[in-house]
Amino acid sequence: MALRPKNPAPRPAPRLYLMTPPVADPSPFSDQLASALDAGDVAAVLLRLAEGDERTLINRIKALAPAVQDRGAALLLAGRADLVARGGADGAHLSGIAEFTAAIETLKPERIAGSGGLASRHDAMLGAEQGADYVMFGEPDPAGKCPVFAAVEERVGWWAEIFEIPCVGYSESLETISPLVAAGADFVALGDAVWREPDSIAETIREAGRHLRLPEPAT
């Protein structure tokens, strides 16, 4: 598919995209997830699964899916495109262009396919050309290390200026949400910043929502 230039129509307000910690036991986490989703405008939840056999992983997905989908958000799986249909998820987020290319045919056109872990501008464009529903910049690598924020901000700004396909910018903290919004992110992803203090999840989401406000237009 050919990349389309950015539509000059008025920009909608960005939305939140939540990344879970690796989930081993869905029972206690389900309440935390519901608290987060009830507190703000969350478009999608990326479910990261702790290691387990296939049946165990599918059961975890099925246990958490209602908390997400009944609240109008999409449930995406980190990596495991092969479990999307059987677990009742809405799609998968694939890290790296090789993983995305290998999985895209199992997801499209019925399911969401997100492209992340992108090492270069070229990889981002390849993912979009192959059918990505969104691209993500700045997410943690497998060791948990994030790129320098200035590089993420620059990449989001470049993409948002040119391309129609939505872009997600990963924010390590609440303080970096507003710069990503100003750069043009359609969605802002949050991970550990949400789950670090279980008793404060709802307030963290509400505060994140305040940072999502679009900047005032220049006069």
Where do the protein language model's features map onto the residues?
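Conserved N-terminal beta1-alpha1 strand-loop-helix module at the mouth
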Residues: 1-93, 106-133, 158, 164-167, ...
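A short acidic, helix-capping loop that chelates divalent metal ions and anchors anionic groups
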Residues: 84, 141-146
